[in-house]
């Protein structure tokens, strides 16, 4: 009897370990479709979102992650912050750049910072390396994307932790862009009402880590930074007054070491005209 109990505990421990490993490492490519007033040339245009890697490594030289990105075959790759992890002993700029150097050959890459970049003490180092690699860093900036004579505006906000006047900054960046289809990259989903107020068409965000633990069947996250317990914006698409916000569950972990019913994800959004 004692032997059976011991073996049962061992088996249970192994199954739990396997489950937690799969939850943390079982990469997903989540495909979404956005319908809106898309310029004709951008019909079918694919945007691949990478968020909240937090210095996590998926196999040797990020091969499983790269395989998923290549599978998407995107027209554009957007990174919405927290490529680095701020915690002592985990911040590794060179490791983060390993992924960047590989994806530069897949599609143009656009980046905005998250709170971890600025809290790591390595932001200036990472910024220089991103620019040297050919990444377009859009912290409080914008870029006009042209395709076959049509254009869209891509806007980026630096993280709120170093950008306290983010609303005023976004208002300034949007000036003169009202008639052009616009996309915003921002780390923070909890600022959704600000994005709505500025009439952004499509927003890509992260930061919430999917609520870390998702309650099955309810699809309710338990906790997200700057939203607290049972947060509203942790994953998926959210729409309000014509603004659509995409929230990535992200790829890595930080303060809390596990994901439960919340596998790491890349997001692919295909643009479609109504």
Which residues are covered by each model-predicted region?
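Beta-strand-turn-beta hairpins that frame and shape the catalytic cleft
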Residues: 35-48, 135, 143-155, 177-180, ...
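Active-site metal-binding loops of divalent metal-dependent hydrolases
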Residues: 50-55, 81-83, 115-117, 141-142, ...
